[in-house]
């Protein structure tokens, strides 16, 4: 059977060669493949490597490293996330907000860099040692390479400092435009397919809003988003209040919190008004409710008004939910318990709230991962969706249906 179908397949190729190329010689060649659209991966929150170099005036514990000659990887280096050492790590990874310049900087004596610009390797694997937990765009990347893509030529990566919000990432959008044009030139002027995860989706929305229609028609084939946090997530409210343990890495949310709440990206990712109504309750206490339009009061009462300052810096990006005007494929998951709100049993916001759950992928609420469909009828380019049920926000990157969908779109 197998032989028969193989022969039949060969025959079709042979005949089509003769028909297509009647003047050519009768040599059996493989049918010309459709040209591959080069890929640029755009990672999400936590999806890029971060290296630091230290020359610190002081450290939080005596055993913390004070100075290093070279840059070393801190994200996602699981050794540095061990108990005790995590305090050293937090001080090296966290940002400090300046409410006058409206920008963040590292702790004194910490220099950072995001390695691997243009390369796919550092977004295929977040952990340079390629530990299993650090697998990121690996499954999609391997599938593409198996089908003819070449790392660093037709498959690129656009990592960024995910700790920051778009208000501080202006240079990233400029660099992404350059990388797009360079990749287009490197690949016989084939338009680009962008593949984004999580926060990468709204980052690309902003990027495309900034480009002219002519530029997009020339350089952009499509965007594919996986678990896109298009319109933020209620989980960001939870992280500001309690921190997050990053799933099953054996970490404590409370230990991760000081680093996490210092990130303007977390304030950017608070629920967007595109899919949250102003009077929707996000946090409740016996005394009062905090609605979407009262998040600023929540952060004041939480004793962390900086969160709202960082949000204000990014409001113009959050509030402009205009269509990107490119072909979109939104791949997402549902039916995983996803935080929708917090309910405190006491009026003390330092107590532990009960989490209210709704539908989503465990991190991003369904209404946000589906928000791409709000642009149907508002842009002429098509918007397709794939819902894979019961797959977690990071696991979905390795989901067979997702990988096959991308394969069908890109290769077959
Ligand atoms: C800025 O920060 C300083 C010091 O933390 C604080 O005293 C001041 O009230 C803040 N200003 C604004 C506008 O938030
Ligand atoms: C990727 O390409 C760039 C520029 O073409 C080059 O500088 C870099 O070393 C390459 N990286 C790898 C891993 O080949
Ligand atoms: C908070 O909102 C809920 C509806 O979401 C309402 O039933 C409740 O009475 C409100 N609580 C307070 C204290 O206003």
Predicted regions and their residues:
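N-terminal non-catalytic accessory region
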Residues: 2-195, 199-261, 268-270, 276-279, ...
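Glycine-rich, aromatic-lined ligand/substrate-binding cores of catalytic
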Residues: 264-347
């Amino acid at each position: 059977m197998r032989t028969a179908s193989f022969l039949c397949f060969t025959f079709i190729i042979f005949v089509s060669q003769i028909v297509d190329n009647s003047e050519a010689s009768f040599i059996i060649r493989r049918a010309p493949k459709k040209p591959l659209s080069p890929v640029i991966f755009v990672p999400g929150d936590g999806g890029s490597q971060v290296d630091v170099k230290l020359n610190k005036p002081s450290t939080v514990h005596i055993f913390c490293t004070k100075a290093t000659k070279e840059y070393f990887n801190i994200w996602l280096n699981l050794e540095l996330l061990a108990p005790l050492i995590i305090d050293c790590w937090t001080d090296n990874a966290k940002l400090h907000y300046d409410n006058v310049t409206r920008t963040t900087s590292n702790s004194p004596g910490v220099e950072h860099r995001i390695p691997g610009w243009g390369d796919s390797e550092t977004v295929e694997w977040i952990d340079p040692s390629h530990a299993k937990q650090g697998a990121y765009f690996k499954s999609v990347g391997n599938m593409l390479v198996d089908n003819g893509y070449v790392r660093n030529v037709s498959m690129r990566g656009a990592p960024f400092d995910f700790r920051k919000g778009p208000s501080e990432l202006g240079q990233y959008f400029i660099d992404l435009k350059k990388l797009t044009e360079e990749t287009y030139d490197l690949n016989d002027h084939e338009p680009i397919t962008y593949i984004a995860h999580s926060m990468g989706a709204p980052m690309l929305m902003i990027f495309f809003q900034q480009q002219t229609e002519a530029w997009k028609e020339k350089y952009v084939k499509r965007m594919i988003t996986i678990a896109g946090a298009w319109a933020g997530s209620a989980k960001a409210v939870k992280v500001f209040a309690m921190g997050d343990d990053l799933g099953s890495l054996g970490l404590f949310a409370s230990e991760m919190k000081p680093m996490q709440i210092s990130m303007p990206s977390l304030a950017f990712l608070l629920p967007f008004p595109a899919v949250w109504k102003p009077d929707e309750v996000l946090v409740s206490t016996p005394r009062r409710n905090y609605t979407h339009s009262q998040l600023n009061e929540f952060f004041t009462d939480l004793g962390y008004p900086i969160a709202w300052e960082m949000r204000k810096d990014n409001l113009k990006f959050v509030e402009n939910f205009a269509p990107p005007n490119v072909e979109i494929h939104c791949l997402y998951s549902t039916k995983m318990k996803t935080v929708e709100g917090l309910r405190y049993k006491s009026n003390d916001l330092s107590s532990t709230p009960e989490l209210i759950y709704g539908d989503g992928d465990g991190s991003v609420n369904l209404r946000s991962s589906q928000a791409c469909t709000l642009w149907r009828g508002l842009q002429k380019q098509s918007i397709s969706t794939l819902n894979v049920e019961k797959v977690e926000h990071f696991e979905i990157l390795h989901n067979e249906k997702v990988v096959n969908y991308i394969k069908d779109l890109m290769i077959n």
